[in-house]
């Protein structure tokens, strides 16, 4: 039976939303044990006695908050829920780490406590985002784990994301593209030009460059980019989506009766659109390249995205994704 180490104190709605999601996922994930780290008194109060089977609570006295400097926090807050959970994974007492807390601290836990897979130059952060073409969306890697990149890093990230798309998203032969400032072969700075050449030489189903305006069109299953560009791209997508949804809601509700009637008539279409661009069902962002699954969900998440992230982690464990990475990179050295 696999065990997921969960930072129960991370995020704005902790610990209640996390525990409610665990209780919702527990009947479906019959081969998973959940280890919750944090304020034991608060956590235990939220778990009915009849639901405590396969749930372990580990008491911790500290919490890493968003304002903490990541590396300093994991060194100084040794008894924080996130750090103790990471050490459980490192010691083999748990098989995966999940948190809604400080992203930088979680990345630091993954890289410095759980550790890199041998042969992986740099771990990278990868979410799944919605696209207009497919309900499965697309993966984009790296979105901020690395401020500086080399062409060889991008190739490894593409290889890891390709495995993920095959094993977790069930895409037999994922298409892989490089995010660049033009579709032509010779576009980009030296980093992207060299990465393009190296990607062409791999066995990946590499389809070339894609531009930023093509991302949401679903032209590729996997988009690889440097961490600086990826982070800026992700935040631009999230910010744009948030503004559009807010403006649409304001337009429909604050301009008299006609827009409200129109919204009622358009409700089936709007519902379908909302479902297509619902990111909750994709789960969390994954730190690929470390010795166990490390997954981050947005700090404002409620029960639903947390629930889907638990299902995502279960799939990663059942498919032995990290084992596949270790085998591949040991053979390629």
Curated annotation (Swiss-Prot):
InterPro entries: FA_synthesis, Phospholipid_synth_PlsX-like. GO terms for biological process: fatty acid biosynthetic process; phospholipid biosynthetic process. Pathway: Lipid metabolism; phospholipid metabolism. Its EC number is 2.3.1.274. It catalyses: a fatty acyl-[ACP] + phosphate = an acyl phosphate + holo-[ACP]. One of its GO terms (molecular function) is phosphate:acyl-[acyl carrier protein] acyltransferase activity. GO terms for cellular component: cytoplasm. It is found in: Cytoplasm. Catalyzes the reversible formation of acyl-phosphate (acyl-PO(4)) from acyl-[acyl-carrier-protein] (acyl-ACP). This enzyme utilizes acyl-ACP as fatty acyl donor, but not acyl-CoA. This is Phosphate acyltransferase. The lineage of its organism: Bacteria, Bacillati, Bacillota, Bacilli, Lactobacillales. The gene is plsX.
